[in-house]
Amino acid sequence: LQIMVAMHTINQNSKIEDLNQINEKLKTCVPSLKNEEQLKLIEASTAMYQRFLKQDYTDKTARAFEAFGYAVLDQKQRDPKKVIQSQKKLFDQLSPRDQYLLQHEGQAYIELLYQGEGMFTYRRQPNYLVDVFSKALPADQKEFLSRMAKDNQDIFYNDGALAVSWKELTERALFWEKFIQKYPKSYFINDAKLLFNEYRYFIFFGLDNTPVSNEYAPNTWFDPDALQQIRFLSTQSQSSLAKPAQQFLKFIATPVDERNTQFKTDLIDENGQKKSTYQIVHEQLEQLLKFDSPWNTEVYRDCHIDAVCIDTN
C-alpha cells in the first residue's frame, strides 16, 4: 500500500501538513480496503503519531516544558495558546519541537493532555480513529473505537485516585461485559477483557487515594457511592459481577477475627515487617474474589489514552 510507505516516513521532524495529507488520503482509501488491511493501517497510524509526538528532552527543555504545563494549569480555560501569548519568555525556553507542537495544538488531532500530578503529555485525540476509520469497519470494531473515544476524552485516574464516579466505573464494567458476550471473536476481544478486568477490580478495591474502604469491616468507614454500586451489582443476576458483589457484602459484614481465621494470610511481609490492616484485608479480598490486580503485569497496556490500547514500557 502506497499510503503505508507515506505513513512510515512521518517522524518527529514532520509537519502538521504531512499528517493532514495522510489523514485525508486515509479517509478516502480506507472504505475500499479489506478489514485486515484496515486494521494494519490503524496500527500504523498509532505508531505514526507516536513518532510524530516523540520528544528528546534535555534537562533544560524538560524543565521548561514542565513550567509551561504549570502555567497552562494556572490559566482559567487551560488554553495553551493563551499561555503562548501571555508568557513569551517561558515559551522561548521550550525546545523548537515543543514550540511547534504547541503552536499547532488542536490541529491534525494533536492534543496537550493533562495527566494529573502536574504532568502534561501530547497525544492523538481519541476521536481520530472514529473519524478516520470507524464508518468503514465491522460493527464490533466500530463499537469498540466509539466507546473508547468517548471514555477517554478525559483522564481515568489522577494522582492515585479515580477521576470518574463509581457509577461511571460500574457502567463501564457492565458495558465491556456485554461487549465480550456479544462479540466473542472480536479483533479487540483481549483488550475488551483487559478493560473489564480492570474496571471490575477497581469497583471492589478502588485506588489508593479513592479507596472503597480502609478496613472493609463492620462499623467502619465506606465510600457511600462505591457501596451503593456494589449493592446494585449484587442484584444484577444476569451479570457475572453479581456473585463477587454478594461475596463482598458478606465479607464486610463478617467480624475481623472471624475473617482472620477463615483466610490464610501472612501477617508479616517478606521483609519481616508487620503488614498493615489495609494490606491484609486486600489480600483476603483478593483470595475471596480471585481477581488479579491490573498492576501485576510485565507490560502495562494503557487503555485510557486513545481509542485503542497502547503498550507502555
Q: Model features per residue range: what roles?
A:
Residues 96-216:
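Extended amphipathic alpha-helical interaction segments
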Residues 1-122:
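N-terminal Sec/ER secretory leader and immediately downstream segment
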Residues 24, 31, 47, 198-201, ...:
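Extended, non-membrane alpha-helical segments enriched in charged/polar residues
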